[in-house]
Amino acid sequence: MSIPETQKGVIFYENGGELQYKDIPVPKPKANELLINVKYSGVCHTDLHAWKGDWPLPTKLPLVGGHEGAGVVVAMGENVKGWNIGDFAGIKWLNGSCMSCEYCELSNESNCPDADLSGYTHDGSFQQYATADAVQAARIPKGTDLAEVAPILCAGVTVYKALKSADLKAGDWVAISGACGGLGSLAIQYAKAMGYRVLGIDTGAEKAKLFKELGGEYFVDYAVSKDLIKEIVDATNGGAHGVINVSVSEFAIEQSTNYVRSNGTVVLVGLPRDAKCKSDVFTQVVKSVSIVGSYVGNRADTREALDFFARGLVHAPIKIVGLSELADVYDKMVKGEIVGRYVVDTSK
């Protein structure tokens, strides 16, 4: 298979600097890496943070962002086993880890102190060819729609892991704060497929419509509700058993600690800048409420999340645009205009 020396990609040289769509070199895979011809990549809010550089973890510079890349294996390093040229493969947020620390040994590779992150510390999927550690790369079944599966590689895995972290059982109520964005729209579907009753919190008629189309049961418009906490407690007959916070609102996180029911779990996923999780200690203790953080999933979570997709139980409401339009997608993110998930086609 002929691999070019150069490719199209979007790169920036300083945080917040110009997003340049240009010719850049095709990377060479290391001994443990795959070279993947990326066909499509989802666009995540994390990509926006990587570009802005507003998280306490520094990015590499210059940087090619992106960590939801779906494509085809075109080359591999000499130490790679279990992969073949032509296999479908996915680039995830966790590009690689040491595999020898206590976290990796317990399958918590994302907590590895030496974790290598796609589109953050490792050039990511906003290019036509990208490298990924062969151990961490996602195995995508042949015949899969690569545009549709791209958001599952981060957004899908992330919310699936968060739902598992809530420790719910079939028939329980789960409230999803930020229900109709890229993460929330998938969380609704995973929750339904896992047997939960779904309450969504977001705003606007378009998002309310999407929520119902995806199988949600009760929608709360936070901009309209006169008493959001009471409305949720009443709708769920005592409060949600679990709350998945994918919104990036500190106030929304604080509210969630008040509408979760006794013995329930509040799961933190979204990462508002400089935010604190505020909870009344007396209430939290008396209600025996758990507040947990949920980061990206491990390899087993990825396999399971992809299986839900392969069986047709979840799909990403996507809008496909060219990679050259990435700056416009970021602008929509900043303005809060994203419904569902944007996916970039690297050929355009």
UniProtKB/Swiss-Prot annotation:
Transmembrane region(s): none
Entry keyword set: Cytoplasm, Metal-binding, NAD, Oxidoreductase, Zinc
InterPro entries cross-referenced by the UniProt entry: ADH-like_C, ADH-like_N, ADH_Zn_CS, GroES-like_sf, NAD(P)-bd_dom_sf, PKS_ER
GO MF, any single term: zinc ion binding
GO cellular component: a single term: cytoplasm
Cofactor remark: Binds 2 Zn(2+) ions per subunit.
Binding-site residues, Zn(2+) 2: C98, C101, C104, C112
Catalysed reaction, written as an equation: a primary alcohol + NAD(+) = an aldehyde + NADH + H(+); a secondary alcohol + NAD(+) = a ketone + NADH + H(+)
Database matches in Pfam families: ADH_N, ADH_zinc_N
EC numbers, comma separated: 1.1.1.1
Localization, UniProt: Cytoplasm
Positions contributing to Zn(2+) 1 binding: C44, H67, C154
Annotated binding of NAD(+), by residue: G178, A179, C180, G181, G182, L183, G184, D202, K207, V269, G270, L271, R341
Cofactor list: Zn(2+)
Primary enzyme class: oxidoreductase
Subunit (UniProt): Homotetramer.
Family membership: Belongs to the zinc-containing alcohol dehydrogenase family.
Protein name as annotated: Alcohol dehydrogenase 2
Source species of the chain: Kluyveromyces lactis (strain ATCC 8585 / CBS 2359 / DSM 70799 / NBRC 1267 / NRRL Y-1140 / WM37)
